[in-house]
Amino acid sequence: MKPASVIIMDEHPIVRMSIEVLLGKNSNIQVVLKTDDSRTAIEYLRTYPVDLVILDIELPGTDGFTLLKRIKSIQEHTRILFLSSKSEAFYAGRAIRAGANGFVSKRKDLNDIYNAVKMILSGYSFFPSETLNFISNTRTPKGGHHDMPLSNREVTVLRYLANGMSNKEIAEQLLLSNKTISAHKANIFSKLGLHSIVELIDYAKSHELL
């Protein structure tokens, strides 16, 4: 039987290598690409079928949610496992609603990634029970969800702003115009009721987004 093909996307080389070594003990899994560059991954996906993409939500130059949509537009059956070192309670819920097949916090045991990959390739999803309980317990009486009122792109901009980046630097990083970043910034401050960068940094820290 042909091994399942896997792409590993993470900004840290040591993380990419560690995951490859971890998956290498399973002869039914083949890592076909390791990269931190979304363009490299997209080019590969346009040429070769891929069973699973292990995707860091906080990749440089993009965000995992935007990249998930691009991947699905090329190969709709490719499965996605999100990784993040940031707030599990916040990001895992968004991962479920974005259509990902699993989420693993990089703060947890590395074997969680291996177990998640096996389950997802077997046709299951992998979301920690704490995440599912969190989502269940935060349902509003009308069936909605208590959630940060920002889009995924606005969350990315918020994180960059909280890390001290200028509008111009963020625009260059995300390949957007200064005008677009300014609009995102205004929306962030308006939606969250913030009045200064100091308040924005405090907000990001309190939500474990830094």
From Swiss-Prot:
Chain ranges of the HTH luxR-type domain: 143-208
Keywords per UniProt: Cytoplasm, DNA-binding, Phosphoprotein, Transcription, Transcription regulation, Two-component regulatory system
Cellular component, GO, one term: cytoplasm
Entry-annotated residues carrying 4-aspartylphosphate: 56
Chief location category: cytoplasm
Pfam families in alphabetical order: GerE, Response_reg
Gene Ontology biological process: phosphorelay signal transduction system; regulation of DNA-templated transcription
Keyword Cytoplasm assigned: yes
Annotated region of DNA binding: 167-186
Keyword presence, Zinc-finger: no
Alphabetical list of SMART domains matching this protein: HTH_LUXR (SM00421), REC (SM00448)
Localisation per UniProt entry: Cytoplasm
GO molecular-function term, one example from the UniProt record: DNA binding
Domain Response regulatory: 5-121
NCBIfam families for the chain: PRK09935.1 (NF007403)
Protein name: Fimbriae Z protein
Source organism (scientific name): Salmonella typhimurium (strain LT2 / SGSC1412 / ATCC 700720)
Taxonomic classification: Bacteria, Pseudomonadati, Pseudomonadota, Gammaproteobacteria, Enterobacterales
